[in-house]
Design a protein with these regions (language model features):
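Conserved N-terminal Rossmann-fold NAD(P) cofactor-binding segment
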Residues: 6, 31-75, 84, 90
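Conserved glycine-rich cofactor-binding loop
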Residues: 15
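N-terminal Rossmann-fold NAD(P) dinucleotide-binding loop
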Residues: 19-20
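Generic hydrophobic/aromatic pocket-lining and core-packing "Φ" positions
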Residues: 23-24, 107
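Conserved S-adenosyl-L-methionine
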Residues: 28-34, 139-142
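Rossmann-like NAD(P)(H) cofactor-binding subdomain of soluble oxidoreductases
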Residues: 91-159
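C-terminal substrate-binding/catalytic lobe of Rossmann-fold NAD(P)-dependent dehydrogenases
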Residues: 138-143, 153-263
Length: 263
């Protein structure tokens, strides 16, 4: 098997649904053969590792540990979903106090155990804030820490697909701006539908203005809708991390360098 790198990737929060999905995605996409799974909840972590072993990925060195020093030592890449998850009735901002404390400790652990890490991706919400906290406490360069608000633009694309009844490949350059939360802004200005600007379609019989306003609300509340239906968000984040790092069209993993917001 040919991998993108042989350097160590550590997945923090690997016993959770998002973390375990990220681990499987990393293996499927052949990011690296050297993957370490970390979670403080050892029984569930072992269960995730066993499931991945049973997938029989060839040529991989998959390890797991509940010791943060062991997990981070030698890691060149880290992806963390190791914060508390949002539950029904909560906003991402409701998670701030607890997850800010987790992010601060995570940053301190990076500084202590893997100061030579090349890149860190922070997934847990509110991602723009927790990522900044990790950056400050880890002592890394802004370009070395990214946060992931990677679903909103695809949610916009998906809502347009459902509304217009056309393939996703015919809807490009979808963008959302601001925080990955209820206050995000959904714009039509960059989006093209079958080669035509979305702004020329809105407020026409094809998409009345009220329908566009309703569609924006569905995009903004997309995560809440899934939580209401399922109780949690599981699968999208892992694939989005991969897509972002590979430069997927319409998505951005944003370095915390002061220029980019959640896109």
């Amino acid at each position: 098997m040919e991998f993108l790198t042989n350097e160590k990737l550590t997945i923090v929060g690997a016993a959770g649904m998002i973390g375990s999905n990220m681990a499987q995605t990393a293996l499927m996409m052949k990011l690296t053969p050297n993957i370490c799974l970390y979670d403080p909840y050892a029984p569930a972590l072992e269960g995730v590792a066993e499931e991945l072993y049973h997938c029989a990925f060839e040529g991989v060195n998959l390890t797991y540990t509940s010791d943060i020093k062991e997990a981070l030592s030698g890691a060149k890449y880290i992806v963390s979903s190791g914060g508390a998850a949002r539950k029904a009735g909560m906003t991402r901002e409701d998670l701030l106090k607890g997850n800010a404390e987790i992010a601060a400790q995570f940053g301190k652990d990076i500084r202590q155990y893997c100061p030579d890490v090349k890149h860190v991706v922070v997934v847990f919400n509110p991602a723009d804030i927790t990522g900044l906290i990790v950056l400050l406490y880890a002592g890394l360069k802004p370009s070395q820490v990214s946060t992931l608000a990677a679903l909103d633009s695809t949610r916009l694309q998906n809502e347009l697909v459902k509304y217009l009844h056309i393939p996703a490949s015919e809807i490009v350059n979808c963008r959302t701006y601001g925080g990955h939360g209820e206050q995000m802004a959904v714009f039509a200005s960059t989006t093209k539908v079958q080669g035509e600007a979305l702004t020329k379609i809105i407020d026409t019989p094809r998409m009345p203005m009220q329908d566009w306003e309703d569609l924006k609300v569905r995009v903004i509340q997309g995560g809440k809708h899934i939580i209401d239906l399922r109780g949690a968000l599981h699968s999208k984040a892992g694939l989005s991390v991969y897509r972002n790092d590979r430069g997927s069209h319409g998505r951005t993993t944003f370095p915390l360098a002061g220029r980019h917001l959640c896109i």
